[in-house]
Amino acid sequence: MTRARKGTLVQCDPSIRALILRMDADRNDIIYEELDDTHLLVDPSKVEFIKYELNRLLSENIYNPLDEEENA
């Protein structure tokens, strides 16, 4: 029997897609379907979590030259 679920379509570049896939590998409850290289169907209740985690992960990778001046 076919089962329908409500989902949210996420469009992103492949690098962000890889981060979301890594998040899902830990939890296995975020992604419903990988549609192609730039589209994912995700659980609508997890969208805010995805945004929060992406902001956290991306902020770790931001270079701030002022940090070097403070540490010098």
Curated annotation (Swiss-Prot):
Listed Pfam families: Tfb5 (PF06331)
Q: Where in the cell is it found?
A: Nucleus
InterPro entries xrefs: TFB5-like_sf (IPR035935), TFIIH_TTDA/Tfb5 (IPR009400)
Which is a Gene Ontology cellular component entry for this protein? transcription factor TFIIH core complex
Domain of life per record: Eukaryota
Where would you find the membrane-spanning parts of this chain?
Answer: none
Task: Name the Gene Ontology biological process terms.
Answer: nucleotide-excision repair, preincision complex assembly; transcription initiation at RNA polymerase II promoter
Keywords carried by this UniProt record: DNA damage, DNA repair, Nucleus, Transcription, Transcription regulation
Primary subcellular site in the record, as a coarse category: nucleus
| Family label | Belongs to the TFB5 family.
What is its biological role? Component of the general transcription and DNA repair factor IIH (TFIIH) core complex, which is involved in general and transcription-coupled nucleotide excision repair (NER) of damaged DNA and, when complexed to TFIIK, in RNA transcription by RNA polymerase II. In NER, TFIIH acts by opening DNA around the lesion to allow the excision of the damaged oligonucleotide and its replacement by a new DNA fragment. In transcription, TFIIH has an essential role in transcription initiation.
| Quaternary structure and partners | Component of the 7-subunit TFIIH core complex composed of XPB/SSL2, XPD/RAD3, SSL1, TFB1, TFB2, TFB4 and TFB5, which is active in NER. The core complex associates with the 3-subunit CTD-kinase module TFIIK composed of CCL1, KIN28 and TFB3 to form the 10-subunit holoenzyme (holo-TFIIH) active in transcription.
Q: What is this protein called?
A: General transcription and DNA repair factor IIH subunit TFB5
